[in-house]
Design a protein with these regions (language model features):
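Alpha/beta-hydrolase fold catalytic core
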Residues: 1-15, 35-38, 73-76, 221-225, ...
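Active-site loop/oxyanion-hole signature of alpha/beta-hydrolase fold enzymes
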Residues: 32, 41-81, 85, 246
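Conserved alpha/beta-hydrolase catalytic His-Asp/Glu region
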Residues: 116, 131-188
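Conserved serine/cysteine hydrolase catalytic core
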Residues: 165-220, 225-228
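Catalytic active-site module of serine/aspartate enzymes centered on a nucleophile-bearing elbow/loop
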Residues: 224-255
């Protein structure tokens, strides 16, 4: 599968992989900062953004898509930053193709299994009738009955676009994502391990990575460190971009 990407800057390749229901647009501001030091590739994963849609959606597929992208673009000594779903993709890639990697940054996700917790979001998204919706504000009103958090709704609505004149739609493939949602929480294979220098960055207010995850992180990633962005939740890179950038660029530039 040929993935869509935006490429900024020159130098060692740094790939950024978004989370579930996200897209490359979400990372543009930070990508411009990284581009002062690296050749930054902001990638749309399959079933997201401007990348192709497919029925298959698992971390093996997402990792293999990334592998194909790296080979097609003749990249090596790669640094990967992956958030949430993108972090899981990055972990799977790291244990499958370590020879292509230089460093790894995993943002607010651990290698463990996560129970399905997107039910209300998917229910709300499925209820949207695009034949009658004429604006994002109308969609937001409908979604508010299912998703209380305003910032979550606005994040989802960023993927809404004019498919054709008078016809709104989402860029993500809701049908495939909802069908395969059980794969999203999958754990890394118990035997998988990676010695690549790895930074796990978690939000201090997030419950995605907790103290109990640390042993598992160090089991799979033997050269890992864990840092916290305080007063930040799951979208720590959006909530505290300056602190997030400082922590990650320091790691990227270290030897």
């Amino acid at each position: 599968m040929k993935l869509y990407s935006r490429i900024l800057g020159k130098g060692q390749p740094l790939l950024i992989i978004h989370g579930l229901f996200g897209m490359s647009d979400n990372w543009q501001s930070l990508a411009k900062l990284y581009a002062d030091y690296f050749e930054v590739h902001i990638i749309d994963q399959r079933n997201h953004g401007r990348s192709p849609h497919a029925d298959e959606f698992s971390y093996i597929h997402l990792s293999n898509d990334l592998h194909q992208y790296i080979l097609e673009n003749h990249l090596n000594d790669v640094i990967i930053i992956g958030h949430s779903l993108g972090g899981k993709t990055a972990m799977q890639f790291a244990v499958s193709y370590p020879e292509l990697l230089s460093k790894l940054i995993i943002v607010d996700i651990s290698p463990r299994f996560y129970p399905i917790h997107h039910d209300k979001i998917i229910e709300g998204l499925k209820i949207l009738d695009f034949s009658n919706l004429k604006s994002r504000s109308q969609a937001d009103t409908v979604l508010s009955d299912y998703i209380e958090e305003y910032d979550v709704r606005q994040f989802l609505l960023k993927s809404m676009y004019w498919k054709e004149k008078g016809q709104l739609d989402f860029r993500f493939n809701l049908k495939s994502i909802s069908k395969n949602i059980s794969n999203v929480g999958a754990a890394l294979n118990d035997e998988a391990n990676c010695s690549i220098p790895t930074l796990f960055v978690k939000g201090g207010n997030s419950n995605y990575v907790n103290d109990d995850d640390e042993d598992l992180i160090f089991k799979h990633f033997t050269n890992a460190e864990i840092q916290t962005v305080e007063q930040a939740g799951h979208w720590l890179h959006a909530e505290k971009p300056e602190e997030f950038f400082k922590k990650t660029i320091r790691f990227c530039l270290s030897y």
